[in-house]
Amino acid sequence: TRDSHLTDLEKLGGVILLLIYLALIPLCGAAILNWAGGLLGFSIGPALRQTIWFYLLFAAVALVFHRFLFVCAGTFTGSAGRSFQTLGTALIFFYGLNEILFRVTHLLWGHTVNLNDTALVSLDLLNAAPAATVLALVVLAPFIEEVLLRGFLFGWLRQHSRAAAYLVTCILFALLHTWAMAGDHFTLYYLLIALQYAVPGLIFAWAYDRSDSIWIPIAAHAAVNALAV
């Protein structure tokens, strides 16, 4: 079984940060920052709230996992050829599988757009604060999500079951990107979006599993988001 490269302290930090990202921020993030803004005497809009949380999480993840990130950087540079090959293969498979799934959903349910790209670029925040939103989508979110979901959770679960590692992280990744949009109205449309988000979830997990460097799925995730924006 491949080593997760994680210390016990990093695993504890990963649990806490993942719970903050998956539960605390979606449920209470707006209320917390609105309360803080009230104390300081100014209003914090949705775009600024997103930026603040992403910066805070980025800093926390970098601090908690700095040793792990350094180890993965060594793996990347030590096997540069394999690393770049994995990155290229991941991008090819992402767009190939995404196109296949798009055509299948179009054939079965008649959708005429790529749901993955639509879910990403139709965010109201992109119009409200384009620079901050692009920074979050292309830099901050890929770093945070890949370190927490792939580096921490996938790496930890892989020590016990590779199949469980793929399954759990793919489901979490898909739900993370659809649940907030769907709210209480999780219709077929959002189920199809979740299925399409399972594609990058699978590809990014494979990229980390094959390269053993978290920088590869981070780069792949950033590239996919940049092209979608």
Predicted regions and their residues:
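Alpha-helical transmembrane segments
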Residues: E10-C28, G88-F94, Y166-L172
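Structural signal for the C-terminal ends of transmembrane alpha-helices
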Residues: L63-A73, A207-R210
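Membrane-water interface of alpha-helical transmembrane segments
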Residues: D8, G14-L17, I44, L48-T51, ...
